[in-house]
Each structure stands twice: as C-alpha cells, then as structure tokens.
Amino acid sequence: GLNRPSKRCLAGSAPCEFHKRSTCCSGHCIIWWCA
C-alpha cells in the first residue's frame, strides 16, 4: 500500500477519521495498510 505517515495515532485504535481506509501503524496513520 501507500506508506504515508500522517497524523499520530495509537496502535490498535479505530481507523483514523480523516481517511476511511487509513490504518494506524508505528504511531502514525497510513493509507491502506502497514507495509
């Protein structure tokens, strides 16, 4: 997927609200999924 660190987040939290398909990875929101 696209690895784009964006806003910070907590691992295991709900998907980031700024993008429906973003995922929390390594403390940051990335689009799609963790590499």
Curated annotation (Swiss-Prot):
Give the signal peptide as a residue range, or say none if absent. Answer: none
The answer to whether UniProt assigns keyword Disulfide bond to this entry is yes
- Let me know which tissues express this protein, per UniProt: Expressed by the venom duct.
Q: Name one GO cellular component term.
A: extracellular region
Name the propeptide positions. 1-35
* Keyword Transferase attached: no
Key words, A-Z: Cleavage on pair of basic residues, Disulfide bond, Ion channel impairing toxin, Knottin, Neurotoxin, Secreted, Toxin
Where can this protein be found?
A: Secreted
Cystine bridges? C9-C25, C16-C29, C24-C34
Using the record for this protein, list the coiled-coil segments as residue ranges, or answer none: none
A Gene Ontology molecular function term for this protein is: ion channel regulator activity
Comment on protein domains: The presence of a 'disulfide through disulfide knot' structurally defines this protein as a knottin.
Q: What does this protein do?
A: Probable neurotoxin with unknown target. Possibly targets ion channels.
What family is this? Belongs to the conotoxin O1 superfamily.
From the Swiss-Prot or TrEMBL record, give the protein name. Conotoxin Cal6.1c
Source organism per entry reads Californiconus californicus
